[in-house]
UniProtKB/Swiss-Prot annotation:
The gene is trmFO. Transmembrane segments: none annotated. GO terms for biological process: tRNA methylation; tRNA wobble uridine modification. This is Methylenetetrahydrofolate--tRNA-(uracil-5-)-methyltransferase TrmFO. Its cofactor is FAD. One of its GO terms (molecular function) is tRNA (uracil(54)-C5)-methyltransferase activity, 5,10-methylenetetrahydrofolate-dependent. It is found in: Cytoplasm. The lineage of its organism: Bacteria, Fusobacteriati, Fusobacteriota, Fusobacteriia, Fusobacteriales. FAD binds at G9, A10, G11, L12, A13, G14. NCBIfam families: gid_trmFO, PRK05335.1.
Length: 434
């Protein structure tokens, strides 16, 4: 096999994979078509664009996403390093200035030795080179057709949604207030409180608001993590108060009481000029978003610098198709990484990009496969998406898929800390000599 690797897609997984291979002295051709042909969800030409949210999840080791990020730091992840540098206040979460993050990743990759960037759509698979498909949740129709031909699988897809962003100066802070749930962090979230009447007025307008038309809408499959707010509302009149609008853990400083419902906004840029409406991914038409979301107390005169959008997300049946290195079982030179594998979320995408790159590098250097067991969070997610099962649904980082402890610990926080400690020790031992 020629010691040159083709990486398709400069999203989170592809960017990480390309960098890790290049750093190990392997030549990489990185295909990214955005400069000439954007997907429905992308707006910038930068690599590793964060589409849905600017948060990479909790940084706490009592959280599986926090553990996965720590594992990536141990492995030397470029993207987590850049995320740490571009952090914005968000309590225990690792949220980033999304433009600053993507700009820095792009600059590094364009200036890294051994990486050649090709701004074209990739559609033809060579037989003499390793190809890593990291084309993401918005894989082009032509490429996905080629993948379908190679794998023999029909296209599987669902729809993701992205939340609106408003300017801080347009938020009425006489009505809204800063506070983090349960007092964690430094009160970085903006909270827009609703009384019962305001909530039901908002609810009634939301469920009847006009939505954008989608192709094959009847076939949609949605993740709870990116479920459109109108879909949540339509599942029950109080459902939002147990989800994105839950008031628990928040005390309104103006009334010193808990409100009936609360809409939270999270800082989206380093300067604190922009805030995204947490959990408000949506498929409403832009005019309807302005009308309905302006009913939220504090957002009556909000300036929307980006409206929410909805877009298709594709993934393959990884449990049937991929081995433990994320290589196709029936095609020796093709690997997959990122959300197209069914690994859900930003951090999982980075992790699979790192994992595939390490395995491809080892293969080209005639070393043993780098297989992580489900003791680590990265190993657990790889195990989940490659272990054959009757019904495969995408999965993100969580402690439910990691191997249980030998001891039974009732306290969840203590148990999660123990799982994280064991995972970190295991990973450090696993990379000795790698």
């Amino acid at each position: 096999m020629e010691k040159e690797v083709i990486v398709v897609g400069a999203g989170l997984a592809g960017s990480e994979a390309a960098y890790q291979l290049a750093k190990r002295g392997i030549k990489v051709k990185l295909y990214e078509m955005k400069a000439k042909k954007k997907t429905p969800a992308h707006s910038k030409d930068y690599f590793s664009e964060l589409v849905c949210s600017n948060s990479l999840g909790s940084d706490s080791l009592e959280n599986a996403s926090g553990l996965m990020k720590e594992e990536l730091r141990i492995l030397g992840s470029l993207l987590i390093e850049v995320a740490d540098k571009n952090r914005v206040p968000a309590g225990q979460a690792l949220a980033v200035d999304r433009d600053g993050f993507s700009e820095e990743v792009t600059k590094i990759l364009k200036n890294t030795k051994n990486i050649e960037i090709i701004e074209e759509e990739f559609t033809e698979f060579p037989n003499d080179k390793i190809v890593i498909i990291a084309s993401g949740p918005l894989t082009s129709d032509k490429l996905f057709q080629k993948i379908s031909e190679i794998t023999g699988e029909e296209s599987l897809y669902f729809y993701d949604a992205a939340a609106p962003i408003v300017t801080f100066e347009s938020i009425d802070m006489n009505k809204a207030y800063f506070q983090s749930r349960y007092g964690k962090g430094d009160g970085e979230y903006i909270n827009c409180p609703m009384n019962k009447e305001e909530y039901y007025n908002f609810y009634n307008e939301l469920i009847k608001a006009e939505r954008a038309e989608l192709k094959n809408f009847e076939k949609e499959k949605l993740f709870d993590a990116c479920m459109p707010i109108e879909k949540i509302a339509m599942s029950g009149e109080k459902t939002m108060t147990f989800g994105p609008l839950k008031p628990k853990g928040l005390i309104n400083p103006k009334t010193e009481k808990m409100d009936y419902a609360v809409v939270q906004l999270r800082q989206d840029d380093k300067e604190g000029k922009l805030y995204n409406i947490v959990g408000f991914q949506t498929n409403l038409k832009f005019g309807e978003q302005k009308r309905v979301f302006s009913m939220i107390p504090g957002l009556e005169n909000a300036e929307f610098i980006r409206y929410g959008v909805m877009h298709r997300n594709t993934f393959i049946n990884s449990t049937k198709l991929l081995d433990k290195t994320l290589k196709l079982k029936n095609k020796d030179n093709i690997y997959f990484a990122g959300q197209i594998t069914g690994g859900e979320g930003y951090v999982t995408a980075i992790a699979t990009g790192m994992y595939v790159a390490m395995n491809v590098a080892n293969r080209l250097e005639n070393k043993e496969e780098f297989i992580l067991e489900d003791i680590s969070e990265i190993g657990a997610i790889v195990n989940y998406i490659t272990e054959e099962k009757k019904k495969f649904q995408p999965m993100g980082a969580n402690f439910g898929i990691i191997r249980s402890l030998d001891e039974n610990i009732r306290d969840k926080k203590e148990k999660y800390r123990k799982l994280s400690e064991r995972a970190i020790e295991y990973l450090k031992n696993s990379i000795k000599g790698v």
